[in-house]
Structure formats: structure tokens, C-alpha cells
């Protein structure tokens, strides 16, 4: 515990906030190119084959892993996608989501509810 005199000499420093999606460089979304599209398994209590893509962000070329939400997708290597921040809790290292229905990523087929999240037009 510092004395009042020590606090007068040098006040307390507030901790810097940690950026949860540093690859976006404070942008809401970024364009990226798929390098590899594959499936991976989630952490311990869950079991599935989650679809993810390793993407290279346009402009400065850092590579991150992005989750492909929804059932079925048309992404392959060299697909141009739009990524946003947002982690997937049961996939370690996945801190970005691919936005469905933007650029090369098609919206989810036969989606009736929560359409805006999966890039589906009103039918």
C-alpha cells in the first residue's frame, strides 16, 4: 500500500484495455481471402465437426482462423469473405466470424428464422 506522498509523486496507472479482435485494426469488418477451409473439433464437453477457415486479411496479410456459421457453405480456397470479431467459445484460437451473404459467402439455404444473421433475403 503506497503512502499519500508516493501517490502524489506518481499517481496510479489505469490498466490498458485488451483488444479482443486485434487483426481487425479497430474496423468493424475486414475483407479476407480463404487460405484453407477445414473442420475442427470443439473443446471437452462438446462434440461436433465445426467448419472454420484460415483467412489472410486484405491490406496487411495477417492470418487468422474464422468460424463459418450456419448449416452448409460454399467456401473454398481463394474465396473472398468479410470477417467480423466475435469468438467461438468452444473452439480455441477462433476469434473471428465470417459474415454470411457478403462477398463470396452465400447465405444459408432454407433459413426461416434469424435470417439477418445468416444473409438470407425474405422469401
Curated annotation (Swiss-Prot):
This is Small ribosomal subunit protein uS12. It holds the Pfam family Ribosom_S12_S23. With S4 and S5 plays an important role in translational accuracy. The modification 3-methylthioaspartic acid is found at residue 90. One of its GO terms (cellular component) is small ribosomal subunit. GO terms for biological process: translation. GO terms for molecular function: rRNA binding; structural constituent of ribosome; tRNA binding. Part of the 30S ribosomal subunit. Contacts proteins S8 and S17. May interact with IF1 in the 30S initiation complex. CDD domains: Ribosomal_S12. PANTHER family: 30S RIBOSOMAL PROTEIN S12 FAMILY MEMBER (PTHR11652). Belongs to the universal ribosomal protein uS12 family. PROSITE patterns: RIBOSOMAL_S12 (PS00055). Transmembrane segments: none annotated. The gene is rpsL. NCBIfam families: rpsL_bact (TIGR00981).
